[in-house]
Amino acid sequence: MTTDTTDYLLDTNACIGIREIIKGANPKNPAKVDQLSKLKARWSSVPKERLFMSIITWGELRYGAEKSNHPSAAKARLDAVRQAVQILRMDDSTGEHYGAIRKHLEQHGETIGGNDLWIAAHGRAQSCKVVTNNLREFSRVPQLHCEDWTA
């Protein structure tokens, strides 16, 4: 039996999905039900010590909670996500990867969102697979390994 030693960096959309699972969301859209079911199955199969989110993702999640109509409840749900997914700190190598990735994208006439660029740099610097349902955006980043747990 092989033990998976891959570290996973969950992007904001993946963490929002986990928040919905923890919350016990019951979406009406069958496609969304299927996506959450697949996400839950994959998330449950990975040891907790292999699951991370970037501090950038944590900031995006907190921003969403702050602007919520019910910020206290939203923050409480985020605390549950925080218990399930560790925050991966950044070091100097993240900045180095950011600069190289941004230069590469500009040279090739490509762009990705600012926060996604930081998440990609963080994942690549730490040799993590980035978990996202936004493969179209993240696939533009060379040498970044990604998975979509909702597909």
State the predicted function of each range.
Residues T2-D7, V85-V131:
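Active-site neighborhoods of divalent-metal-dependent phosphate/nucleic-acid chemistry enzymes
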